[in-house]
Every structure is written in C-alpha cells, then in structure tokens.
C-alpha cells in the first residue's frame, strides 16, 4: 500500500492550481465556493488546531460530489490557515486511490485524508455524508417507481437523462 510522506504530498496541486487546470464544472465549483459560509465556531476550532494539518484530496472535475464538497474544504483551508491542502487527480494517482477504496472496492471521490505534521493519518472523509447518500437513494427509488421508463432502480445514475439527474440531485 502506498505510503504518504511529505515528498509525495508536496507533488499535489494546491486548491488554486486545481481550479486552474479544471476543464469541466469550474463555474459550478466556484458558485458553490461563493455560497459556502463557515460557522464562526467551526472556523475558530480549525484555527486553534495544533497544526498544520495536511489534507490529501482525491478529486476529478467531472464528479458532482467533488464539486459540492471540495469548495468547503478550500474555503475552510483559506480562512482557517491551519490546513495544508493538496489535490491529486484520482485517475492519474491510482496508487493513492487504492489506499482509500470505499467499502474496499469502489473508487469513490472525493476522498479527504487528514495527516498530522509527521504524516500519521488522523482521519478520512469519503464521497459524501451518509445522510446525503441515504436521501439520494430514497429519491432515486421514488423517481424510478414514478417513472419506470428510466429503467431499474439499480441502474447507474449517469444513465438517466441529464434533466432527470439534475432534478434528483437538486432535491
């Protein structure tokens, strides 16, 4: 399994570098970033960390969960000043992705892995909060029950028509 060390971490993109290289969804990511409001108590908690905390993020610009969650991390890092974020493109860093497979088999992103200054891992966030996953699954079940023409419930969401996917994920 790949070990994360200071040298490997340093090869990742900064948040601004990641945004600059995006070829898709940059407007959506920046709109989400503009909407993010960090609670003052949360911001103070991050500012008071014995830092720095190094955050390795696995991301791709086509992923809706990345577009939703990465702006929160980017803004928090900028405002708190204690998070050192480096972003690695999942599809170009399969060795890192193998370390953080969701349920041991899925290449879910984003992944945010948190490390102390000795690069000992202290926590991992994968994809999205469980409550969001549950809510999305329920919405998809309802949608497929109401619209059998969209295929079976278990069909991948990317097979749905774009306007339908947008409706499902917006709710």
State each model region's role.
Residues 61-68:
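Conserved redox-active cysteine motifs that mediate thiol-disulfide chemistry
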Residues 1-53, 74-84, 90, 97-108, ...:
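Non-globular targeting/processing and membrane-anchoring segments
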Residues 61, 91-93:
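Short, solvent-exposed coil/turn elements at secondary-structure transition points
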Residues 54-60:
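Short glycine-rich or small-residue beta-strand-to-loop segments that form or flank ligand, phosphate
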């Amino acid at each position: 399994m790949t070990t994360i060390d200071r040298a490997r971490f340093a090869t990742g993109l900064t948040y601004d570098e990641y945004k600059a290289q995006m070829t898709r969804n940059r407007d959506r990511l920046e709109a989400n970033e503009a909407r993010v409001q960090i609670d003052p108590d949360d911001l103070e908690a991050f500012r008071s960390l014995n830092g720095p905390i190094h955050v390795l993020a696995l991301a791709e610009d086509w992923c809706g969960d990345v577009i939703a969650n990465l702006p929160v991390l980017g803004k928090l890092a900028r405002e708190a000043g204690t998070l050192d974020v480096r972003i690695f493109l999942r599809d170009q860093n399969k060795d890192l992705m193998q370390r953080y497979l969701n349920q041991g088999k899925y290449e879910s992103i984003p992944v945010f892995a948190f490390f102390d200054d000795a690069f000992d891992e202290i926590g991992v966030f994968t994809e999205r909060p469980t409550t969001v996953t549950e809510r999305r699954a329920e919405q998809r079940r309802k949608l497929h029950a109401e619209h059998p023409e969209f295929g079976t419930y278990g069909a991948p969401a990317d097979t749905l028509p774009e306007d339908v996917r947008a409706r499902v994920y917006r709710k």
